Regions:
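N-terminal regions that are enriched for targeting/export leaders
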Residues: 4, 10-19
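Non-transmembrane, aqueous-exposed alpha-helical and coiled segments at domain scale
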Residues: 8, 108, 137-140, 159-161
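Glycine-rich N-terminal segment of FAD-binding domains in flavoprotein oxidoreductases
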Residues: 22-119, 131-137, 227
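Short, acidic, Ser/Thr-enriched surface-loop or helix-capping motifs
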Residues: 87, 124, 155
Length: 267
């Protein structure tokens, strides 16, 4: 472990961290920059003191990749602002630490959303890009990479690199777990939705044949789905499941749905 006696910049301090499920505990020098210049300063400090540094978003990954015991972490969660929003082009440019749920809250009332919506809505944009995550609507929209229009990458030497989908490094950065550099910002393509509300249907399946048949229908009739499988079922009950399927509600239905939601005590 590197010495903790060497004074780092004011936005860097040694902290204990745990993995998402609490199974791993580490101690790292955590930098929480609010500007690109502070990101550069953190990288420079690590170069000067022979330390490795790992980018960290919201810490919501199950793979526990954003832990760097005894070394440095660049926590991008404070860089979470909307840089630009082009409603006509349906594109939004955000900083790396912007959470997906904050994007939804910013655009849903404008009848827009992210085409590929990961299951973990509290993940950061950069984390979703680095892991190229997918969600319950992957069969329609693929993984998160498909909606990335362009991004800005901070290299280890402090230089920045603008990368769009035609750039030779694009496919290496997306899904690259941050190994090529630090994502500073990204422009994402949004898609129109009929309303900000969804209808969720709960569909039981008594066995694997029923599961496959139901999912074939759900793929045509719904926008997203998740299956909860009873792993202990055996014999004729193998594959026993519950399917949660969702579809966007058409605009004409939203007012009655809104009244039902408010009557149930939700906002």
């Amino acid at each position: 472990m590197k010495s903790e006696n060497q004074t780092p910049p004011s936005f860097m301090e040694w902290q204990e961290l745990t993995s998402l499920v609490g199974s791993i505990r580490t101690r790292s020098l955590v930098a929480r920059p609010t500007t690109v210049e502070q990101c550069r300063e953190a990288l420079a400090y690590c170069r000067q003191h022979d330390m490795t540094i790992c980018a960290r978003g919201a810490g919501r990954g199950y793979g526990e990749l954003a832990l760097n015991n005894g070394q440095a972490l660049l926590d991008m969660s404070a860089m979470n602002r909307i840089i630009a929003f082009d409603e006509e082009a349906a594109q939004i440019t955000v900083e790396a630490g912007m959470r997906l749920i904050d994007i939804y809250q910013a655009v849903h009332h404008r009848l827009l959303t992210l085409p590929a919506s990961p299951t973990e809505s509290h993940s950061s944009v950069a984390g979703a890009i680095c892991a190229n995550v997918n969600g319950k609507d992957a069969w329609h929209h693929g993984s998160f990479a498909r909606q990335v229009v362009r991004l800005t990458l901070l290299l280890a030497d402090g230089e920045t690199l603008a990368i769009d989908r035609s750039h030779e490094l694009f496919k290496a950065v997306v899904g690259g777990i941050g190994l090529l550099g630090i994502i500073l910002e990204a422009t994402l393509q949004l898609k129109p939705i009929p309303s900000p509300f969804v209808e969720i249907n709960r569909l039981p399946a008594p066995d694997v044949d029923a599961l496959l048949a139901t999912m074939a229908q759900v793929e045509k009739s719904h926008d997203a789905a998740v299956v909860w499988v009873d792993a202990y079922a055996r014999g004729r009950k193998t594959g026993r499941s519950v399917i949660h399927a969702a579809r966007w509600i058409e605009r004409d239905d939203t007012e009655s749905q809104r009244r039902e939601i408010l009557a149930a005590g939700y906002e």
